[in-house]
UniProtKB/Swiss-Prot annotation:
Its main location: membrane. The lineage of its organism: Eukaryota, Metazoa, Chordata, Craniata, Vertebrata. The chain crosses the membrane at residues 18-38, 53-73, 81-101, 166-186. It is a multi-pass membrane protein. This is Transmembrane protein 205. It is found in: Membrane.
Amino acid sequence: MEKGEDPGSLIKVIHLLVLSGAWGMQVWVTFISGFLLFRSLPRHTFGLVQSKVFPVYFHVSLGCAFINLCILAPQRAWIHLTLWEVSQLSLLLLSLTLATINARWLEARTTAVMRALQSIEKERGLGTEVPGNFQGPDPYRQLRDKDPKYSALRRKFYHYHGLSSLCNLGCLLSNGLCLVGLALGLRSL
């Protein structure tokens, strides 16, 4: 498109719906559903639910980032991009990259380690309790202290989980900043 040419109302609406939908989904999954499920479900049931939800969530995030990048990238000749447009494209590329890392690499590894942990826990009769409902000493801490394999798997799980959480927060922040930019560019409400 030439400099200043309007991309059309439909493209603008699609861009806004995909971006805001992705951001809303990310807020819900990151800050609401995970905490509610963690506090309400038995530990292994929570893990099973998350292992089903996260692949879909990460792939939808990836798809939304890809769609938004495809909508925005061809709108202007690259030489005519403003600082904000370059920033927005960079944020969407970051979101796409982080969502891809989560969807294609981290999720599978995190789930595999979680299943290995759950297997050991099941052998010890653990995993059916809702987190936070312990009476007496923490049986998971005792298991960590006694079983070096379990302890190593747990560290590996938290390593992958931590990286995945950082990628997810990066996507959330990137999309949020893009939405802020769009909101600041509104001429009226």
